[in-house]
């Protein structure tokens, strides 16, 4: 649904990186490597990285049913 604000495992804030991560890896004409983007954003822990890499934004799909 919506990107989590904090990592489920360690509690670090990850939501602040979502918009830039999405823009650079999914919506760009030439998408960048997610590993490089996360390194540049300063997301170091693997638990926090998986929160951004594995997120699927379903808000637009689910919202008509609410």
Curated annotation (Swiss-Prot):
It comes from Haloarcula marismortui (strain ATCC 43049 / DSM 3752 / JCM 8966 / VKM B-1809). The keyword Zinc applies. Zn(2+) binds at residues 7, 10, 47-48. Belongs to the archaeal Rpo10/eukaryotic RPB10 RNA polymerase subunit family. Binds 1 zinc ion. Its cofactor is Zn(2+). It catalyses: RNA(n) + a ribonucleoside 5'-triphosphate = RNA(n+1) + diphosphate. The gene is rpo10. The lineage of its organism: Archaea, Methanobacteriati, Methanobacteriota, Stenosarchaea group, Halobacteria. HAMAP family: RNApol_arch_Rpo10 (MF_00250). NCBIfam families: PRK04016.1. DNA-dependent RNA polymerase (RNAP) catalyzes the transcription of DNA into RNA using the four ribonucleoside triphosphates as substrates. This is DNA-directed RNA polymerase subunit Rpo10. InterPro entries: RNA_pol_su_RPB10, RNA_pol_suN_Zn-BS, RPABC5/Rpb10.
